[in-house]
Amino acid sequence: MPNDPSDMNNELHNENTIRILISSDPHVGYGEKDPVRGNDSFVSFNEILEIARERDVDMILLGGDIFHDNKPSRKALYQALRSLRLNCLGDKPCELELLSDTSLTTGDTAVCNINYLDPNINVAIPVFSIHGNHDDPSGDGRYSALDILQVTGLVNYFGRVPENDNIVVSPILLQKGFTKLALYGISNVRDERLYHSFRENKVKFLRPDLYRDEWFNLLTVHQNHSAHTPTSYLPESFIQDFYDFVLWGHEHECLIDGSYNPTQKFTVVQPGSTIATSLSPGETAPKHCGILNITGKDFHLEKIRLRTVRPFIMKDIILSEVSSIPPMVENKKEVLTYLISKVEEAITEANAQWYEAQGTVPVVENEKPPLPLIRLRVDYTGGYQTENPQRFSNRFVGRVANATDVVQFYLKKKYTRSKRNDGLYTSAVEDIKINSLRVESLVNEYLKTNRLECLPEDSLGEAVVNFVEKDDRDAIKECVETQLNKQINLLVKKRVTEENLEQEISSIINDLPKISTTKRKDYEELPEEVSETSINIAEHTPVLKHTSSLLDHHSPLATSSSEHEMEATPSPALLKKTNKRRELPSSLTKKNTRTPQRSKEVKKVPARKLSQSTKKSDKNTQSTLLFYDPSSTTEAQYLDNEDDEILDD
């Protein structure tokens, strides 16, 4: 179980504790055109970064959805860049030592992958983030808005997923004192696809071989946490048990206290969003960020309530349970009087909530709470008269922030048990059907009765969503070209002649509907255990170079003939000091001199291999550190991307 490092003396705490501010889903740019709520996302995002600067953290870790729009406006980009520059740049030296080559996780190698190592800018607090479902890559070049933040040197964008059906998760290795951090990230992948990828053992997690029991393994994901449907979420049982901590993005409900998974033996923390993007129950909990203090393998989470978040109160009202309103033909006046009184109570409660969030911070004289968000969900089943929701809401213009949708009237529906899910997901599925009719759903409904011959329905549906919701004008064109190229390559590979060309094309077309409509019954039951995936060690074992203290410890897999070398230390150009950068105190720059005992069962690396890895002009002797999957004994079987394709239901 995690321990509280607050009992440690200050010197040990400073030298060996990695302090990480964790947050998720700031949705910068949400509602920016709203006359009342337009600046809410900018203010809350800036508050998070200010907390990081004031609390003197070592780094910031975000769980995705920095931006609300896939193509953020100039205003949203400006506000995000401004907050990052004001709070994360400075001459304070970063005490984190990078031990791995990050080219596998952070993309473009032409620019410095980790911003605090760049000699051209002074980064005091590095920001690490994965992308979410709102700011995911799209369009020509598959760029994300986070790529813009990275190329400016303000954010370290990691956890990219170039291939959905072959995901390799490589960590960023950081060290401070004797504390070693392996930072993993999986950016957002469509939930059904990621679910199937895990079930088919197409997700690989690479681990450091040396000192493997000393690494604190932290994973960041951006997926559905709760099971809305059988496959549209990421079960915790799919995540390997070598992790110590999981930062869960995408879900907006703030569960900052976290929960311990006794089966997988890791702690899951869901920070939630920093702004309410919908008037739903999950957004009502007070918004928090947290500071994760890691010392060795122990950690302690300090939660911090956000002060600038607009208060939000939601109340559920069932009129049939209100004794003062008898069901009769003429009861509209009584209903409206009762609902108005409930809105007044909610406004008073919201103001008290805002003052509570200020804590010990003194409130500026004459400062008033921001206009609150109020939502009444009213069940008027049983013959009750109501008023037009917008007309009712307009009574509170100037008193609430959402003066057009304060109330939501609905009639209670009888839920039927689904044979497929046996009633487990009925409520959630019904809510989805009522509240969120997506373009993708319309496309799928249309294609049920109008089958396509050459294009897979799911891919076309996803392309339509990207075209409509993410303004990706080339999405449909790219989808069509990609699928046609696959079929052409398949015909070429089969060496089809002109005589049987039409027959082969018809065969391919006839096979596509069978593949796309195949019911994956084997996916409906969760596995008892999902172990680390089976991979071919010879093909998937990149090498890291490490300091001479690791020279006496070698992996038995070091003789692999197809290792890929990764520089663990920055290039000499990145080690140059700038005029503004201050040197670290000598007490903070001492290396960990503990030498591990050599295991008797470990095979030595051949002399030839050692000589190749130690021929460096650098003063420090280098050795090798391997990533590998310890449970792997057989090579995983993969589908040929050009020949076969398993499509989602």
From Swiss-Prot:
Mn(2+) 1 binds at D25, H27, D65, H252. Pfam families: Metallophos (PF00149), Mre11_DNA_bind (PF04152). SMART domains: Mre11_DNA_bind (SM01347). Residues 640-649 have a biased composition (Acidic residues). The active site is at H134 (proton donor). One of its GO terms (molecular function) is Y-form DNA binding. It is found in: Nucleus; Chromosome, Telomere; Chromosome. Residues 586-596, 610-636 have a biased composition (Polar residues). Its main location: nucleus. Keywords: Chromosome, DNA damage, DNA repair, Endonuclease, Exonuclease, Hydrolase, Manganese, Meiosis, Metal-binding, Nuclease, Nucleus, Telomere. GO terms for biological process: DNA double-strand break processing; double-strand break repair; double-strand break repair involved in meiotic recombination; double-strand break repair via homologous recombination; double-strand break repair via nonhomologous end joining; meiotic DNA double-strand break formation; mitochondrial double-strand break repair via homologous recombination; mitotic G2 DNA damage checkpoint signaling. Residues 553-649 are annotated as: Disordered. Forms a multisubunit endonuclease complex, MRN, together with nbn and rad50. This is Double-strand break repair protein rad32. It comes from Schizosaccharomyces pombe (strain 972 / ATCC 24843). The gene is rad32.
